[in-house]
Amino acid sequence: MAECQDFAQFGLAPNLLSAITRMGYTKPTAIQCKAIPVVLQGRDVMGGAQTGTGKTASFGLPVLQKLLPLANTSTSPARHPVRVLILSPTRELADQTAEALSNYAADTPIRIGVVYGGVDIKPQAEALRRGVEILIATPGRLLDHLEQRNTNLNQCGIVILDEADRMLDMGFLPDISRILNALPKKRQNLMFSATFSPEIKRLAGNFLTDPVVIEVARQNATAATIKQEVFSVNELQKTDALVELLKTRGEDFDGKPLQTIVFVNAKLTARRLARELEKCGFNADAIHGDKTQEERLKLLKDFKDGTLNIM
C-alpha cells in the first residue's frame, strides 16, 4: 500500500482513531501507509526512515491495535505483563516515544512505561512492578531492571529496535544481544534505521525473520523538510557569521525569534557559544553530556515550549 488517504482504511479501532484525530493527524505519511498494514499482519519489518517521517506512529498504532483484545482495567500486575518492548538509543527518544504512544492510547486502558539511566531507578521499578504492557527502554537500564527482577519479558510478543543505527554507533550491540536472548523465541520483530549500513544488515539478518523491507527515504538522505545551505567562513569568523545569520534570518514575519538548533563538535564549544550568543542578546543555552538528566529535560521542554529560542 504505497498511497493511502486516511487512517480509517487500516481498520484501526475507533478509540485510536479519535486519539490521533485530536492530535491533528489527518493523512498518513509514506512510511505509515507502508508499515501499518504489514505490522498488523504480524510480519517482521526492516524499515528505513528519516526523522520527521512519522515513524513512531507507523509502529505505535498497529502495535496498540494488536494489544486491544488483551487490554483490561484490572489492578493486578499479572494482568499487565510486558507484551511489547521498544528499545531506544537515548533517554530523549525514549521519552518522546512514550509520550507519543501515551497520546495514541489515551482512550484505552493499555499501560505504557519508560525506563532509562541517569535518573533514580526506584520510581521506575515501582511502575514496572505495577505492570505495563508496552515498555520503552534504553538497553543498559533495561538490563538493570531485569537483573533486579523488577520485570520480565516472558510474555513479550513484539520487539522494536528504534534508530538501530544509532544504537550500534553507541556500542549497545552486546546489551541488545543479552536482551534478545531473554525474550521468547516466537515473537514479531521490527527494526527501524535511518540507514541500511552493512552493520545494520548484519543485525537484521540475526534479528529478523523473512522481513518486509520498507524504505521511504534515500539512504543517508536529509529529511525533505530541511533546506541545506553551505557558507564558506574563516575559522575565526564563524561566531560573527552565525550572529549575523541569526539577526537576518532568525525571526519570523511577525518579528518573533525562530527556534534554532546549532550543532558543534565539543561540549566546551557549546558552552562558549551559548555564552557568546547570550552576550549578543539572544536567548540561548547549551545542551551536552555534562548536564544532568533533569537539566537536559528542562532545556528540551523550554525549547519545545518556546521559552528558549536557540539550543
Located regions from the model:
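Conserved helicase RecA-like core
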Residues: 1-311
